[in-house]
Amino acid sequence: MSDQVNIIPIQKIGEDQRGSTHIFETDRTGEFIIAFRNKGSLSGRHYHKGRSDHKNPEKIIIMKGEATVNWIDIKTGEKGVAKAIAPAMVTIAPWVWHEVVADEDMVVFELNALADGQGDTFQLEQ
């Protein structure tokens, strides 16, 4: 695991014939994003500078499915790959370009609103 991208397992607190129940903690409130991604699709492909509190770090929860997170630290050039298997929280530090590859159909819960990325989302060529 690195300081740039972390995969944090989501704690299971119960399971029965209906399925399982998991918990996580966050200090974030307000609007959130739920994304349904098809197998093979790419998301992200950008980085944040941490101007928005909710992008410092960026936090997404893989609720269903599996993803590969490719990343590059913009400041150091360090590169890495992390595998997230639901349920898991992915944290992405500022100044880390990231690409989320849906290894299978997946459901993603983002702990931020669309407005949080405005003015704090950059492509590699910027």
Q: At which residue positions do the language-model features occur?
A:
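Glycine- and acidic-residue-biased ligand/ion/polar-headgroup-sensing regions
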Residues: 55-72
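Short acidic-glycine-tyrosine-enriched beta hairpin
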Residues: 14, 73-94
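A short, N-terminal "cap"/entry segment at the start of jelly-roll beta-barrel domains
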Residues: 1-34
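Double-stranded beta-helix
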Residues: 3-6, 99-126
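Short, surface-exposed beta-strand-loop junctions and turns on beta-sheet-rich folds
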Residues: 51, 75-77, 107, 115-116
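A short, compositionally biased micro-patch
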Residues: 27, 62, 85, 93-95, ...
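Conserved short histidine dyad/triad with adjacent acidic residue
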Residues: 14, 34-56
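Short beta-strand His + acidic residue motifs that chelate non-heme Fe in jelly-roll/DSBH
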Residues: 21, 45, 69-70, 92, ...
